Every structure is written in structure tokens, then in C-alpha cells.
Amino acid sequence: MATQSVLVRRDGVVVDAEGNAAIYFGDVPQGNYCVTVRHRNHFGIRTANALNFIKGVATAFDFTTPTANIYVNPSITSNLPTKTITVAGVDYRTLWTGDINQDGFIKYNGSKNDRSVILLKVGGVLTSTSSGYSAEDVNMNGIAKYNGSLNDRSVLLLNVGGILTNVLKQHL
């Protein structure tokens, strides 16, 4: 197993710290490996099948295409491993956002819900905000916000389909 810290650009392209789209895993031996992508406050996803890594040869996999072979946990029937969005008539797969407490669930209500974590971040004050890089910034605009326009709580509610008791589950 090997890990590599990378950046996910707004357009979904994964790059290394220098902005290169080719991600290197050092001295990982040639072989077949599943690739997993994780991002703060998002569900992780992985390839359904191992990819063949050959030393000196780039291996590409586009997680965003609707036909990408992404792992689906057969015991989870409440949601797919990714969320599909349509931009200019083209469908793209995206990571589910909102797993603020990183427990593998996106919950709006109930115990260990992600909504309450946003409220705690702003000090329990409904109209307060907190700026900076944080897991509570679900919409990734640099501000954790519970109420008002561009609040992070609404993203959670949209992801659970507007049904307060719905729970999304990570497929890893």
C-alpha cells in the first residue's frame, strides 16, 4: 500500500503539490493495485478493479466519467458511491460532500449528524461564520456558515434529498 498527498482542483483534476497531473508513488513495485481517492469532508471512492501499474508508464483513470468502473458496495442500496451532476449537458461523477466528522455517513439529523458539527464550528451562533480551510466548509468557499445564503447546512440537506432522516453511506 502507498499513499500520496495531492490536490483536487475545482475542475476535478488531481495534481501533486507542484501542479503536475502525473502522480508518482515512489518505489511501488509493478503490479495490480486498486486506487482510492479521498478528500476532506467527502466520501472516498476507489476503482472497482485493480489497475496495472508498470514502472515508467503512466496509468490513467478518470473517476468523473459515468462509465468509470467505480467500486459499489453491494450491501449499500441507499445511494451510489458518487453523485452525478450535469454541466452543459454532460454528466460527471463527483464525490459526495458532507461527511464532516469522517464517520462514513452523511447525516442531517440524529446522533453523530454532520449538520451539528457546522453549528459547533460557528460557536453555536446561527448567524456566525468561520473563515479558513475546515471540514465544516462543505461548499468549499472558504467560509463555514450555518444560516443565510451560501450556507453549508443546505448542501447536506440537498445531498440527503431534502429528507431529514435519510443517511448516505460511503462505499469503501
Residue ranges of model-derived segments:
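Cellulosome-associated attachment modules in secreted, modular CAZymes
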Residues: 3-172
